[in-house]
Amino acid sequence: MSRLVLAIGNSRWHWGIFSRDQAPQFWDAIAPHQPFSRSDLATFLQAQDPAIVADTPIAIASVVPQQLALLPEDWPQRRLQLRDVPLTNCYPQLGLDRAIALYEAGCQAGWPVLMIDCGTAITINAGDAEGQFAGGAILPGVTLQLRSLAQGTAALPSVEISAEGDRWGMDTQSAIASGVIYGIAGALRGFIEDWRSHHPQRPIYFTGGDGELLAKLLTDLPDIRVEPHLLLHGIDRLAQAMMTDPD
């Protein structure tokens, strides 16, 4: 039987289908503005995988709790909370997505581990040798920085970001792109080097929509791993564990 997972983010819903017989499937969708009916949700899911049947339970992690109301109440759901993540030393306001993705990185690579989620905001998340949350940082992501420049400065053009862009921009677009992308990469390098001074030769996970892009700028650092769907893998791992041990 297929297993459905859903990560509800600030602007997009991230879906995954896991099963024993085939590789996982992943896709994103813009956050809906209207509630799903039961039949609409079934149609939406079966367009991705015809094998999905109505009432297939969905394991959910949401950083936007109000969007949970957009799902039909009578569709089976397991809504994860921070207390469901076996990661100790978490402060109460720690984002559920951060905790799950860090836990999954630790499950995949062992502890200690560093996980960097490059989404709307970029979060840097450290786990120590005992599997505890060991602190982190939050900074504006690529899109958020570009949006801030556009809103705060008149007549700036739209900009496309590329890891192959020249550091020394020869026009406004390339100068903005360089400032944003290399500025973020420089900040991340500082955190990584500090963490590695305490935990040499331990892996660094990059995830999120801009994870691969930013990781390309740090390829000189050892053991950088890109896992775009780390959060969805973590949701599935936790949901399976909860089914095995519901207490």
From Swiss-Prot:
Its cofactor is NH4(+); K(+). It comes from the Bacteria. The active site is at D97. PANTHER family: TYPE III PANTOTHENATE KINASE. Pathway: Cofactor biosynthesis; coenzyme A biosynthesis; CoA from (R)-pantothenate: step 1/5. One of its GO terms (cellular component) is cytoplasm. It catalyses: (R)-pantothenate + ATP = (R)-4'-phosphopantothenate + ADP + H(+). The keyword Nucleotide-binding applies. The gene is coaX. Homodimer. It is an enzyme of class 2 (transferase). Catalyzes the phosphorylation of pantothenate (Pan), the first step in CoA biosynthesis. Substrate binds at Y91, G95, L96, D97, R98, T172. GO terms for biological process: coenzyme A biosynthetic process. Belongs to the type III pantothenate kinase family. InterPro entries: ATPase_NBD, Type_III_PanK. K(+) binds at D117. Its main location: cytoplasm. Gene3D superfamilies: 3.30.420.40. Keywords: ATP-binding, Coenzyme A biosynthesis, Cytoplasm, Kinase, Metal-binding, Nucleotide-binding, Potassium, Transferase. ATP binds at A7, I8, G9, N10, S11, R12, W13, H14, T120. A monovalent cation. Ammonium or potassium. The keyword Nucleotide-binding applies. This is Type III pantothenate kinase.
